[in-house]
């Protein structure tokens, strides 16, 4: 089937992002950020983790956060819990939190060292749980199974994981589900240490689709430590098609990280605004107001006290129609001045302007005789830069 896969996106700024930031950020500031995110058109937001503050002190206020924010209709609010105790805590806040869907999946980390650092279990202990997971699925009459691998392509402790090695691990899980009479329909790939590369992600997805035709649901949790995660998502969009579902997690401004991966905040995620900009420019509907989302990034920078890592929040989206730049605007040199795409002229007030006369051009849609001149050249207006259909209205 042609076309792009169905995309299900989860915003991780409140969870993966804030878990690596200052533990003393006031809860009121977090509530303000969550309220703003809720008004951007994002379909799903992870609000935080129900975990021990001993291990993740940044999440100590998650109960107060959920009690204090203003949920919006149409937004799915999710959470992270690593054990039954966390799940039970979260039940007290449903709604607004969406009930957790009970899905049984076999999981393993390709890096034994990271498994111990992150989950306090060895890889062998993770594998030993598989038969119990599948037996529970059989007992419950589950019709579909899932499998997931972390550090699929490598880690900072063992280096690169060859394609054949992680595919063999997928195959071991798949065969166990198959022997139990349960087809695997979902697969997850996590990359906490940022080892993804577009050509390797492509090869893995092609391999999965060729070997396991029952799988139609793919989850990619990619970190952007080496700056190529967005390209890896693009590779996934080209491999998968309209019969598939692609689940993605990103974070506003790219803020994210893991204290156990050895890189801290440098293990950032794809910036949500960069992903949404790319999808919209590819003609993929997101429902997100990109300008409101960028204002959330600026707010997040105030909350955490430092500049974040995305690009679209600094340069702005590719401008169309009424968003085209003023041709005689002055010299723009700083990041603050570049915010004129939202703030207008006040962003560059007082900047140096060398132009003696106003700059005009026939190539602007507002120019007299613009359409007629295009027609003489045999071109259609929508084929010229600056006159493409606007994808998101402000």
Can you say where each PLM-predicted feature lies in the sequence?
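Catalytic cores and adjacent flexible loops of soluble metabolic enzymes
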Residues: 1-394
């Amino acid at each position: 089937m042609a076309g792009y896969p169905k995309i299900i996106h989860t915003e991780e700024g409140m969870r993966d992002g804030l878990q690596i930031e200052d533990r003393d950020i006031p809860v009121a500031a977090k509530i303000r950020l969550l309220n703003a995110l809720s008004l951007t058109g994002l379909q799903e937001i992870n609000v935080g983790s129900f975990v021990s503050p001993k291990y993740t002190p940044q999440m100590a206020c998650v109960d107060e956060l959920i009690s204090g924010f203003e949920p919006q209709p149409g937004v799915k609010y999710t959470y992270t819990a690593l054990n039954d105790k966390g799940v039970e805590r979260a039940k007290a806040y449903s709604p607004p939190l969406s009930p957790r869907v009970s899905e049984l999946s076999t999981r393993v980390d390709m890096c034994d060292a990271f498994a111990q650092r992150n989950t306090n279990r060895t890889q062998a202990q993770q594998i030993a749980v598989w038969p119990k997971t599948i037996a529970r699925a059989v007992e419950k009459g589950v019709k579909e199974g899932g499998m997931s691998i972390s550090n699929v392509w490598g880690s900072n402790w063992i280096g690169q994981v060859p394609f054949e090695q992680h595919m063999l691990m997928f195959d071991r899980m798949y065969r166990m589900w198959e022997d139990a009479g349960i087809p695997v329909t979902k697969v997850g790939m996590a990359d906490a240490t940022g080892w993804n590369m577009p050509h390797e992600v492509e090869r893995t997805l092609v391999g999965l689709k060729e070997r396991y035709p029952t799988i139609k649901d793919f989850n990619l949790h990619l970190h952007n430590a080496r700056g190529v995660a967005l390209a890896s998502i693009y590779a996934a969009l080209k491999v998968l098609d309209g019969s598939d579902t692609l689940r993605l997690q990103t974070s506003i401004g790219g803020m994210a990280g893991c204290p156990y991966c050895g890189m801290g905040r440098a293990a950032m995620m794809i910036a949500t605004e960069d992903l949404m900009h790319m999808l919209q420019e590819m003609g993929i509907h997101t429902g997100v107001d990109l300008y409101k989302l960028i204002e959330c990034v600026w707010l997040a920078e105030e909350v955490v006290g430092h500049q974040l890592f995305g690009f679209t929040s600094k340069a702005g989206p590719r401008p169309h129609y009424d968003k085209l730049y003023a041709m005689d605007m002055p010299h723009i040199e700083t990041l603050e001045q570049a915010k004129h795409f939202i703030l207008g002229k006040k962003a560059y007030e007082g900047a140096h302007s060398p132009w003696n006369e106003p700059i005009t051009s026939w190539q602007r849609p507002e120019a007299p005789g613009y359409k007629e001149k295009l027609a003489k050249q045999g071109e259609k207006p929508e084929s010229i830069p600056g006159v493409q259909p606007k994808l998101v209205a402000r």
